[in-house]
UniProtKB/Swiss-Prot annotation:
Homodimer. It catalyses: S-adenosyl-L-homocysteine + H2O = S-(5-deoxy-D-ribos-5-yl)-L-homocysteine + adenine; S-methyl-5'-thioadenosine + H2O = 5-(methylsulfanyl)-D-ribose + adenine; 5'-deoxyadenosine + H2O = 5-deoxy-D-ribose + adenine. It comes from Photorhabdus laumondii subsp. laumondii (strain DSM 15139 / CIP 105565 / TT01) (Photorhabdus luminescens subsp. laumondii). Transmembrane segments: none annotated. Catalyzes the irreversible cleavage of the glycosidic bond in both 5'-methylthioadenosine (MTA) and S-adenosylhomocysteine (SAH/AdoHcy) to adenine and the corresponding thioribose, 5'-methylthioribose and S-ribosylhomocysteine, respectively. Also cleaves 5'-deoxyadenosine, a toxic by-product of radical S-adenosylmethionine (SAM) enzymes, into 5-deoxyribose and adenine. Thus, is required for in vivo function of the radical SAM enzymes biotin synthase and lipoic acid synthase, that are inhibited by 5'-deoxyadenosine accumulation. GO terms for biological process: L-methionine salvage from methylthioadenosine; L-methionine salvage from S-adenosylmethionine; purine deoxyribonucleoside catabolic process. The gene is mtnN. The keyword Amino-acid biosynthesis applies. PANTHER family: 5'-METHYLTHIOADENOSINE/S-ADENOSYLHOMOCYSTEINE NUCLEOSIDASE, 5'-METHYLTHIOADENOSINE_S-ADENOSYLHOMOCYSTEINE NUCLEOSIDASE. Keywords: Amino-acid biosynthesis, Hydrolase, Methionine biosynthesis. Pfam families: PNP_UDP_1 (PF01048). Substrate binds at G78, I152, M173, E174. This is 5'-methylthioadenosine/S-adenosylhomocysteine nucleosidase. Its EC number is 3.2.2.9. The active site is at E12, D197.
C-alpha cells in the first residue's frame, strides 16, 4: 500500500519529512512531494500550500504522479467543539465548505453545484485513526470539519459557521478541497488534524503560539497510523 499524506504548511510536514527513508523530492506547480518509506510503509508526502486552490492542485498532482491508495490530511485546525483543547485530535467523518453558497439553485449551504453536500471520509481510515487515538491515549472528537479561504478569528464569522453547520467540530482551510478531489478520483481519505487554536477572538494569537504543538500531535498520529498499517500488511 502507498499512503499519500498532505499538509499545507512547512511546519505541518517538516517532522514527517525528516523521518522519510530514501527520500526523493518532486517539485510541481508550486508544490513539493517527498517520497520514500516511513515506518515500513511507502509514503508520498505533499506540502500543498495554504487554501482550497493550493490544496486541490496539490492533491491532484499527488494522485496523478504518485497514485497513492489512500490519502491522510494532517496538520492543524481551529477547534469549535467545546470538548477540544490545544493539541487534541479531530477526525473527519465528513468535510464541507463553509464559504460556498449556491442555495439559490436548491443546494444545501456549503454544497458546490453538481457535487455532494459533503465529502465523506473512509470508514476503514476512520477506524484506523480511532485505533491509534486509543493506543496513544489522546483526547479526540470525530465529526464534521468545515473548510474555507478564511482564518476564522472573531465572533461574527464564528457565529455564522455555527449557525449554518451546527454539528461542526473544527475549521481550517484545505480539507474539503482535498476531500472533493479524492471524491473525483474515487480515492479513500480521512482528515486527522490537531487543534492549534480554539476559534474565538484571540485565535490568531493562539495559532502562532501553538502551531508547533499541533504539528507534533498530528505527526504522532500519522506515524501511529503508518506503523499500524505496516503491522497489518
Amino acid at each position: 500500500m502507498k499512503v499519500g499524506v498532505i499538509g499545507a504548511m512547512e511546519q505541518e510536514v517538516t517532522l514527517l519529512r525528516n523521518q522519510i527513508e530514501d527520500r526523493q523530492t518532486l517539485s510541481r506547480g508550486g508544490c513539493e512531494i517527498y517520497t520514500g518509506k516511513l515506518n515500513g510503509v511507502e509514503i508520498a508526502l505533499l506540502k500543498s500550500g495554504i487554501g482550497k486552490v493550493s490544496a486541490a492542485i496539490g492533491t491532484t498532482l499527488l494522485l496523478e504522479h504518485c497514485q497513492p491508495d489512500v490519502i491522510i490530511n494532517t496538520g492543524s485546525a481551529g477547534g469549535l467543539d467545546p470538548k477540544l483543547q490545544i493539541g487534541d485530535i479531530v477526525v473527519s467523518r465528513e468535510v464541507r465548505y463553509h464559504d460556498t453558497d449556491v442555495t439559490a439553485f436548491g443546494y444545501e449551504p456549503g454544497q458546490m453545484a453538481q457535487c455532494p453536500a459533503a465529502f465523506v471520509a473512509d470508514d476503514q481510515l476512520i477506524d484506523l485513526a480511532e485505533k491509534c487515538i486509543h493506543s496513544l491515549n489522546l483526547n479526540a472528537v470525530r465529526g464534521l470539519i468545515c473548510s474555507g479561504d478564511a482564518f476564522i478569528n472573531g465572533a461574527e464569522p464564528l457565529a455564522r459557521i455555527r449557525a449554518t453547520f451546527p454539528q461542526v467540530t473544527a475549521v481550517e482551510m484545505e480539507a474539503a478541497a482535498i476531500g472533493h478531489v479524492c471524491h473525483q478520483y474515487n480515492t479513500p481519505f480521512v482528515v486527522v488534524r490537531a487543534i492549534s487554536d480554539v476559534a474565538d477572538k484571540e485565535s490568531h494569537i493562539s495559532f502562532d503560539e501553538f502551531l508547533a504543538v499541533a504539528a507534533r500531535q498530528s505527526t504522532l498520529m500519522v506515524n501511529a497510523m503508518l506503523a499500524t498499517l505496516s503491522k497489518d500488511k
